[in-house]
Amino acid sequence: MAKQSIRLSDHFTYGKLLRFTLPSICMMVFTSIYGVVDGLFVSNFVGKTPFAAVNLVMPFVMILGGMGFMIGTGGTALVSKLLGEGKQEEAHRTFSMLVLFTLLLGAVLSAVGIITMPAVSRLLGASDAMMPDCVLYGRIVTGFTFAFMLQNVFQSFFIAAEKPRLGLFVTVAAGVTNMVLDALFIAVFDWGVAGAAIATGLSQCVGGVLPLIYFLRPNTSLLRLRPAALRLRPILQSCGNGSSELMSNISSSLVGMLYNFQLMRLIGEDGVSAYGVLMYVQFIFVAIFIGYSIGSAPVVSFHYGAQHHSELKNLLRKSALLMAIGGVTLTVLARVLAAPLSRLFVGYDASLYALTTHAFRLFCWSFLLAGFNIFASGFFTALNNGAVSAAISFLRTLVFQAGSVVVLPILLGVDGIWWAITSAEIFAFIISGVFLVLKRNKYHYM
């Protein structure tokens, strides 16, 4: 029974911290895995050109969906702080208003994605051969942006509601839906990239609509959906708090576009396909760190709101050690699995397989420091300091990485592209440490 009674107000041991964050970690990993399934089916059943096309437009798709991460993480920090201050009714109203705002914004962005997809595909560097698949896949997937955003929002709010296991269940349900429909639409019906896009969109509906139904009905969680009018101040505060998550998403997408541009210039279509494989695997590995950050953030926000300084120190100290252990473990695992994972995606093409395996063994060193940097950004989001969180995220995912992608190939050739992300993580680690030291007296976590 003790394992089922963890509350935001508790003192967290290593075991309790891991148990509380495990559902969100599993949720993010499973979300990443079922996203990877699209790539596996498209690469193996449709071909490497459609696979490259999907990878080319994916950064744009993720930018739109990233708005949901911004609202979810920033809104959860605000709502959890209100709960810590004992303002239950205001927490309900803020939660409800943010869900309504997500629905409205998602509908607008869905329309924008559908209308602009041909121009976006061409801007991203799609070749004539890739263009039809880019537009077809992109238009279908962005049509479901409203559902994607809702899914991302509820992933965070389930934790603030003290229902992380229910969040995991919803994610698994969405993932199984995507996997089954991918197999049916691509392997059986032979619908190609359209099948992959439809499968993804329908799975996002499962992930976004099921939580909506749950929170609309009487439930045992800390949060309820109530009639609510849009209020500018909490919307701006939530978006400000979560701006680092949006910045990370946008920056990663922009850098992804830069990677693709450099690879098309230096290697060609095979380079984009190899990078796509690295991104799919990175999604899964980094999802562990993101899941921990999402899972622990409401705890940090609650204790910040309650002014429990000793618990903030405890959470930071334990989290830093867990991120270090996770970084070493994932780096070793990535080195060992480089060849098998590359073979799984592109084993049908010997030269592409060799390129991907080589790139993987250079790329994997980035996992050593990624966890700490992701947690540091999320930690400041949880403290309702969106500016510092966004600065860490912006420098890590855009400035340092974009600079490395441009400069390192000049010094190291093509290998410089694969080393770029590790270079960015090293610089981000330094910046994260500086901010933690500078802000220690304000938040009393050291």
Model-found features: residue ranges?
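Hydrophobic transmembrane alpha-helices of multi-pass small-molecule transporters
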Residues: I63-G66, N178-A183, G208-L212, F283-A287, ...
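Transmembrane helical elements of multi-pass membrane transporters/channels
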Residues: R19-D38, I140, Q151, A174, ...
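Short runs within selected transmembrane alpha-helices of multi-pass transporters and secretion channels
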Residues: G72, I140-I159, V170-N178, A196-V209, ...
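Helix-terminus/linker motif at the lipid-water interface of multi-pass membrane proteins
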Residues: I33-F51, S121-D128, L184-W191, S253-I284, ...
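Hydrophobic/aromatic residues in alpha-helical transmembrane segments
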Residues: D38, G75, T116-M117, F154, ...
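N-terminal transmembrane alpha-helices
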Residues: S9-V46, P59-G74, L78, L82, ...
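Small-residue-rich hydrophobic transmembrane alpha-helices
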Residues: F51-A111, F148-G167, A274-A338, A370-I392
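Short alpha-helical transmembrane segments in multi-pass integral membrane proteins
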Residues: M1-T21, V79-F146, V188-S243, V300-S366, ...
